[in-house]
């Protein structure tokens, strides 16, 4: 006899405004407790010292996490000039110092090479694995290692304010795997200066934005008032860029059983018109209910992820 899962069968997304000095794992645990959810996860780690958008998946929404991991992101951050650190942020130990204080104009003059597809070496204090171990664990233990250069995409990088000679505020829009701390490290080097990230806030992950994010305390207060449903977003929120196809009740039943369905010629043509080249992923919907994520092959839809939603 199968063991009954602990918690409630709640499914959906939470757009959390993660507070300062809280790990992403701890944020997941607190939200899971608030909802008494059977299962929870997050779509992309946010450093403890960073604040902002942390999309959290509950229940069946965890099946859609991989689709959000590839989404574009946006950040707002502050550079503090004068000191380089081990962690590339204000919490690290000083590795170098300088009296150089780049002006706004000087920074803007060197931004162009940091926009587009660029080569970036991730910070040693990162979650990247090295021979099966997290880089940040090796760094804390004093183990010497080198991370490989990776290709990342920066869609936009702009200076937004220069509050004083020691600080500069910027905004960045980028693809997955781009590290703000590495951008600041390399920007300071290009200017012959020392600098680190003083403040960091993620403002967007895909369609999840800071304007719709909810604070952790607010969420926990809703839990006490039995109003958590007000903060819960549909499972398909993370699938905004994936074409949707309405299916009949009969086809929905077949897909739920893991069986393929045959598409009408007009359905094939309509999907081809919206699918990007090389992409065959389609979400099958029965009314407002997500039935399955499917792959379109030879005029049929083959279920890849089936959702148990009511």
Curated annotation (Swiss-Prot):
It catalyses: uridine(55) in tRNA = pseudouridine(55) in tRNA. Responsible for synthesis of pseudouridine from uracil-55 in the psi GC loop of transfer RNAs. One of its GO terms (molecular function) is RNA binding. It holds the Pfam family TruB_N. Keywords: Isomerase, tRNA processing. The keyword tRNA processing applies. Signal peptide: none annotated. The keyword DNA-binding does not apply. Belongs to the pseudouridine synthase TruB family. Type 1 subfamily. GO terms for biological process: mRNA pseudouridine synthesis; tRNA pseudouridine synthesis. It is an enzyme of class 5 (isomerase). The active site is at residue 47. It comes from the Bacteria. This is tRNA pseudouridine synthase B.
